[in-house]
């Protein structure tokens, strides 16, 4: 789900299939490995020159993409939504509800430079997303799981949090850095036999996927949960609804799922548990909200 877009954990792979058991057989000696590591370290140092911090959590991020580039892509993607998706009429109850919640969240986002807009798409899919620049899209299939206005705020504030933290730009920056490291490693390995290069690049690909890409995707989702919880509390919605929403969402999606370390998203139960731990802080924020409304209007 846009409730569904690297540090967290590492990958342990117990199989040695496809990997050399003898360093000389693979044709990779200690010097080549050290050169490769030095190349990757150099790319990492260059990347740090583009660091920024995520809002609320303060996590340091690699950011090489100008935000205006992200916003331009978001604006184009939002125009495509209007062309390609069946929208719910703007005067319908669902559209008015999504618009109202969106206005409240936008009002506490501290991004008055965004051109905030909302759309409701007629679809049974349980999905929502926010595009750079403040374009929020909600599929009406998720509304029954929301149950009430605060549940909808959980979904929408989570998606807005991805944009405020510029997770899309961070992922593009990380991919750019990984591509640069791969090029550097390929250069170091250029004089090795093809089989040695293939083995090394396969291992590199697995390491970056399971040790960098997937853990950071989960990190982004958890961070969006954290930021979103504080946003909904600022906007006047009871943050206690957040773990309840994820419990309902898990119950509504009981099909077989991949193990968490193979997934881009944390397990739903873990999300609910993590949000419970953040509730005391979020409730303090909620008590200072200008216009607290609790769970708001019932949806079902």
Which positions does each model-derived feature cover?
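A Zn2+-metalloprotease active-site environment signal
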Residues: 2-300
